[in-house]
């Protein structure tokens, strides 16, 4: 049976930076308050770009590093909660078109911050079944477009960006296991209420700020830590791997406090953990591939590295992945 492997990663980080000191001038907050509660110091904003632009630029990097012809890509899948358009066309279709790919499978998924883990599970299935040979997966978000910049509880948390990977078949350094799950009963704790069918876009929903992201932070924090820790234990035990065997633990970059809490529960060292939330904030589905790209560029992510990915997001959704990196 063919095995699926991540053979390359890429990312795109917008140039414009919003610091905590900038936010001090916008809302009732302070650098000290933000850092103490989130660990975040800066985030990047895509002022003159849309989600498909970010995704396209991350995809170009992943394709170049993979050393494959773009025409060998036979599927483009994008995870995003900030698509260019509400219904259609999909962001993936736009990215494929921008790449000059006009006869490929292309579609979006919506799994919030767990999006990249969901993408991995889909790409793994497509490659290992023989349905596809080279799958381009992208997590891309322009969260600045759905943030209420007058709400200090959310506007300090999020940033824009994109991360991409190529998943292909390989005899070694493959994706060992992927687990995804959800619990829709708690979806109201992290939600963008407006602009869907329940609250269609109109003057009333805009006046009530329903088109912005709403989050019950304390409740989400507790559920996230407990769920993430259990999910990691489950996938490690299932595959007879201990935390000491892991070369890099790359969690979703939601909040430094969440990352630290999970790290301590599972006995990961600082050297094992990849942390980028300090510089980029929470970029939802883009955070894991962006963090993988950072680790690759600084030499920590190497061919054959045993990697553990873990994420929790709106829905609620969550998931984890265990893999050996196949990139060069």
UniProtKB/Swiss-Prot annotation:
Residues 253-257 are annotated as: ACP-binding. Its main location: cytoplasm. Its EC number is 2.3.1.180. Gene3D superfamilies: 3.40.47.10. GO terms for molecular function: 3-oxoacyl-[acyl-carrier-protein] synthase activity; beta-ketoacyl-acyl-carrier-protein synthase III activity. GO terms for cellular component: cytoplasm. It is an enzyme of class 2 (transferase). Keywords: Acyltransferase, Cytoplasm, Fatty acid biosynthesis, Fatty acid metabolism, Lipid biosynthesis, Lipid metabolism, Multifunctional enzyme, Transferase. InterPro entries: ACP_syn_III_C, ACP_syn_III_N, FabH, Thiolase-like. The active site is at 113, 252, 282. Pfam families: ACP_syn_III, ACP_syn_III_C. It catalyses: malonyl-[ACP] + acetyl-CoA + H(+) = 3-oxobutanoyl-[ACP] + CO2 + CoA. The keyword Mitochondrion does not apply. Pathway: Lipid metabolism; fatty acid biosynthesis. It is found in: Cytoplasm. Belongs to the thiolase-like superfamily. FabH family. The last Arg residue of the ACP-binding site is essential for the weak association between ACP/AcpP and FabH. Catalyzes the condensation reaction of fatty acid synthesis by the addition to an acyl acceptor of two carbons from malonyl-ACP. Catalyzes the first condensation reaction which initiates fatty acid synthesis and may therefore play a role in governing the total rate of fatty acid production. Possesses both acetoacetyl-ACP synthase and acetyl transacylase activities. Its substrate specificity determines the biosynthesis of branched-chain and/or straight-chain of fatty acids. PANTHER family: 3-OXOACYL-[ACYL-CARRIER-PROTEIN] SYNTHASE 3, BETA-KETOACYL-[ACYL-CARRIER-PROTEIN] SYNTHASE III. NCBIfam families: fabH (TIGR00747), PRK09352.1 (NF006829). Homodimer. This is Beta-ketoacyl-[acyl-carrier-protein] synthase III. It comes from Campylobacter fetus subsp. fetus (strain 82-40). The gene is fabH.
